Amino acid sequence: MAKVQYFGTGRRKKSVARVRLVAGDGKVIINNRDIENYFPIETLRVIVNQPLVLTETKDKYDVLVNVHGGGFTGQAGAVRHGISRALVKADENMKSSLKKAGFLTRDPRMKERKKYGLKKARRSPQFSKR
């Protein structure tokens, strides 16, 4: 009999995470590396584990993630979004608590584009009176 897997795709800023949940003992593997090695900052690991802690499924599933694009924070948010979506596919009853916590909502905030005549998105060149 094949192992039951649940898939979820998460996005945040420029990052895209493809998440697989497999029945297991709570290991989180990101890009073939352990979560402690991939996210050295504790707050990022907390962000990734939030949906599992909220639904009390930390020890039920192994989480296998493939994530690319963006930086650390964007990738952590994308992984959290993907795990939440996969948990909903695994158990529909978790949807209300995850939605209430805001983990199923795609964060729409993106980097604002640079405009011509300006140094950055909103920063204008230095003004000289004389």
Curated annotation (Swiss-Prot):
Keyword hit for Ribonucleoprotein: yes
A biological-process GO annotation: translation
Origin: domain of life: Bacteria
User: Basic residues bias located where?
Assistant: 111-130
Arranged from A to Z, the UniProt key words for this protein are: Ribonucleoprotein, Ribosomal protein
| Molecular function GO labels | RNA binding; structural constituent of ribosome
**Record's NCBIfam families?**
PRK00132.1 (NF001099)
Query: What name does UniProt use for this protein?
Result: Small ribosomal subunit protein uS9
Gene assigned in the entry? rpsI
